[in-house]
Amino acid sequence: MNKEADLKDQAKNFRLFSETLDIMKKAWSEDFFSHQGEFYTYPSPNFIWQHDMSPPKEKVVDLKTNELKQISVLPKPYQKPFPPISQVVDGERSIQWAAENGLNTIMWIPTVKALKKRFEIYKDAKSKAENRDVPLGEGISLVRDMFVAETMEEAEKMAGEHIVNYMRWVCHWRGLGNHMDPDEKLPETKNKLDLLNYEFLHKRNLLFGTPEFVIEKIKELQQELNLQNLQVWSNFPGIKHEDCMRSIKSVSYTHLTLPTIFAV
């Protein structure tokens, strides 16, 4: 979406992302800042400040030329120097880069087996960068699609078609590779999404079913990955609002769920 980005030049994209992040940190943490990099320059060169109600200050304006030297972004964040920053990651290089640059990470689709390798890559890179033994799971949030109903069949009936349709949209570009276990090979099909159905998704990464089933799947994530942060999404396209809210409440407010999960 950035006009400077180029799908054929990932090295450039990394530099672009890194510079953007540097600018964000400056804007949040410094009263006034300037930046001159490969892609961006702030303030814009030769920007002249002339305003009778806001006379120029030497710190931010060249008093001889009235050219703006620094800018400020308001309001500043409450957390100092700035809030924790999370990067959505998937590939090994992105995971390592995030860990080396002090960023938390967000992961989404992969299976537990595939996530374990990603979690370990982040742990190792973060441990090296911070010169300490970082626990597995620290700094990582996992997103899972969730729909809770009274029975397994009801969950599939109410939400199964919608999650499959959504994943069909997502996988249009990426195929099914991100849903596979390490070293797994799928049978050849005429079209790349022929295997995509509810059963294919459910056993890999869906929290769809009864409260008891969802609890057990979350416990598995905790036990296998030492998962510390879970984000669930229930309002995917096609789901009725009242069904979405009922699903969320059944996990958030029943005696079967949060106390049971956090007792692990």
Located regions from the model:
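Acidic/polar active-site rim loop that often engages polyanionic ligands
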Residues: 1-7
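An alpha-helical appendage that flanks or caps ligand/catalytic pockets
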Residues: 10-76, 113-225
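Active-site mouth loops of central-metabolism enzymes
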Residues: 82-89, 203-209
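Hydrophobic faces of well-ordered beta-strands that scaffold small-molecule active sites
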Residues: 85-88, 105-107, 138-144, 230-232
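A conserved active-site cap/scaffold subdomain adjacent to cofactor or substrate pockets
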Residues: 99-111
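Short glycine/threonine-rich loop-to-helix capping motif typified by GTGT followed
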Residues: 148-153, 240-250
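Glycine-rich, proline-tolerant flexible connector loops at the mouths of alpha/beta enzymes
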Residues: 234-240
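Conserved small/polar residues in nucleotide/adenosyl-binding loops
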Residues: 254-260
